[in-house]
Regions:
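Active-site neighborhoods and metal-handling regions in enzymes and metal-associated proteins
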Residues: 1-199
Length: 199
């Protein structure tokens, strides 16, 4: 699946982007609280990325409750956080080499939903290695989320990351599938489990 043979310098840029992203994700999540502004959190995260030496790979996404993913506050957005389930999705690039992550912040009083997604991510990461099929990763995600009494969101998937490309093959499902693509050494992927208490 690797379109480009990544050399050591390119791997280092992916790693640097990931390190910046991990720090910004955690710091931005701490800013998500009832009454805080969606736009201010997004703008703060994007500026923090730049302070640390990266660039935003895409506008910060702040999605609420059943929205699940891909909502971005507009320039005039005055929305504030309430007692919500918040998905904060952030990307960083260093010279076009991307890292992409999300974190769920529970302001709703239902922490089990966020815990199910986090546990599914950890289980999936334990599965990833060269030669594993994406369907196997999906099966681990589904089994973990099911174990919490929730359902995986099946119309959203993880994905590959390329040079200046946010979504590349392979797709990484959030459920078991019979057909999958075998991961190769050098593939860079974002694994994105989503759990729901709906269908």
């Amino acid at each position: 699946m690797t379109d480009v043979d990544l050399d050591a310098e390119q791997y280092e840029k992916n790693r640097e982007a990931g390190e910046i992203l991990a720090q910004v994700r955690n710091e931005a999540a701490d800013r998500v609280e009832v009454g805080a502004s969606h736009l201010e959190v997004a703008e703060w995260a994007e500026e923090r990325i730049r302070e640390l030496g990266g660039e935003p790979a895409f506008p910060v996404n702040i999605s609420i409750d059943e929205e699940a993913a891909h909502a971005t506050p507009g320039v005039d957005d005055s929305t504030t956080f309430g007692e919500d389930m918040v998905n904060l999705d952030i990307g960083v690039h260093v010279d076009g080499w991307l890292a992409d992550t999300a974190v769920t912040v529970d302001l709703s009083g239902n922490p089990e939903l966020a815990e199910a997604s986090e546990a599914a991510l950890e289980a999936a990461l334990d599965t990833v290695e060269a030669g594993v099929e994406t369907g196997e990763i999906g099966a681990v995600i589904e089994e973990t989320i099911d174990g919490y009494g929730f359902n995986p969101v099946v119309n959203l998937t993880g994905h590959g990351l390329g040079h200046w490309q946010q979504h590349t093959p392979p797709n990484i499902p959030n459920r078991a599938v019979d057909q999958g693509i075998e991961l190769e050494a050098g593939d860079v992927v974002a694994i994105e489990p989503f759990a729901t208490d709906g269908g």
